[in-house]
Amino acid sequence: MSRDSITDVDLAPTIDHSLLNPQATDDYVRQWCAEADRFQFASVCVYPAQVRLATECLHGKKTAVSTVIGFPTGATTASAKLYEALEAVDNGATELDVMINLAQLKQGQTNEVYRSIAEICEESNVLVKAILETNVLTPDELALAVNLCIDAGAGYIMTGTGWNGGVTLETVRQLKTLTKDQIGIKAAAGIQDLEFAIDLLTAGATRIGTSYAIAMLRQYAEAKHPKEKQPPEDRQET
């Protein structure tokens, strides 16, 4: 990819600055929130137990607080996911990344998959991103899952958790075709490089979930303004 094509993309507003290392302490949350505010990322994504702290850190800021629900397997009950979602919203989350129940999808329990997402969308009244774990779905299952999540009211389809491999360009292209622009596409898992992130956006993604956002911004700044000062290196890494 050329330098010109990289710098044509406004990267920061597409990024969910993800902190999903279970060993990440509160200091990391504060750091991630400060970075997200500084660079105007779309959101900071943290575990539910750290939503309240992230909300305090980003009070009055434009960056949203996102969290994961039923993560990473989706193999909890619909009522448990709903409780987790509503508690997260009470603590300040304004975006929810919700893992669907893969077993239910694969054994044809489409009503259960639909209802679980629909209830969270209706009762939480915040942006819901449904995680599909695309790498373990057949083409027919993927198409079915997309339609169920659109009908349920989700605002985004998210490619996966990272527990079953990373996102691919081909998957994002498939989702672009399947969604027909009716819903956003969040590409996540294994996105560590600026060029790959830009390629995913070009393929149809509208959000990028990554914990490597600062490294990407350094690459972006170097491509756009080679002689200008880059984001600082003195940061903790998870």
Tell where the protein language model's regions lie, with residue ranges.
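Glycine-rich phosphate-binding active-site loops on the catalytic face of alpha/beta enzymes
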Residues: 67-72, 90-105, 151-168, 187-225
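Alpha/beta catalytic cores of nucleotide-metabolism and tRNA/nucleoside-modifying enzymes
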Residues: 1-34, 173-185, 191-238
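Catalytic cores of alpha/beta
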Residues: 55, 76-87, 137-148, 173-177, ...
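Alpha-helix-loop-beta-strand connector modules within alpha/beta enzyme cores
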Residues: 48, 52-73, 110-136, 166-193, ...
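Glycine-rich, proline-tolerant flexible connector loops at the mouths of alpha/beta enzymes
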Residues: 33, 37-53, 69-73, 96-114, ...
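Generic structural signal for well-ordered alpha-helices
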Residues: 29, 33, 51-52, 85-86, ...
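Conserved N-terminal beta1-alpha1 strand-loop-helix module at the mouth
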Residues: 1-91, 144, 148
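Short, well-ordered coil/turn segments that N-cap beta-strands
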Residues: 40-42, 61-65, 92-94, 124-128, ...
